[in-house]
Amino acid sequence: MLLTGSRGAGKTTLIDALTQGCDLPGVRSYARREKPDGPPDCIFLENRRTGERRVIGRFLGGRMEPEAGVLDTFGVQALRDAMEGKNRWAVVDEIGFLENSSPAYCRALEELFRKKRMLAALRKADSPLLCRLRSREDCLVIDLDVLEDRQEHTGAGFPPEKGNL
């Protein structure tokens, strides 16, 4: 299951709700901001199994610059850890543009998709990796922006309010 949507659409919130109480392997990326309303100064990648994390992107010269070497080593190993676990499912939150800087990470990620059932958040953007993942026939893609649009037009909430199932 692939969740996509604009920034703030609820991809991570939904993944957290769906996996609550489950100890699923995989990776999680998140931004660190020095100012709450400012741009991120760096992006971390965390191994969900071990809790280890590394910086995979730094905000330099007005743009986010990938740390491809970290994805090549730490990132690939975190994905391999998820592949080797006993769980049938793995979680990746979120896949964006930084991953494209590391062909080894992209290959390991696609291998994880072949070996495990996946719950993943995809940045709403176009890149070769994101397009390949969204076009997989074995994945259900849910666009949270489309669900939000439907809610506005029909009045149906997502998730449904208690008692409105």
Give the residues covered by each predicted segment.
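Hydrophobic anchor at the beta1->P-loop junction of P-loop NTPases
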Residues: 3
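The conserved Walker
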Residues: 7
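N-terminal phosphate/diphosphate-binding loop that engages ATP/GTP or pyrophosphate donors
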Residues: 16-63
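Conserved lysine of the Walker
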Residues: 11
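Short glycine/proline-enriched coil/turn segments at helix->beta-strand junctions
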Residues: 20-24, 86-87, 114-117
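Phosphate-binding/switch loop-helix module in NTP-utilizing enzymes
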Residues: 60-110
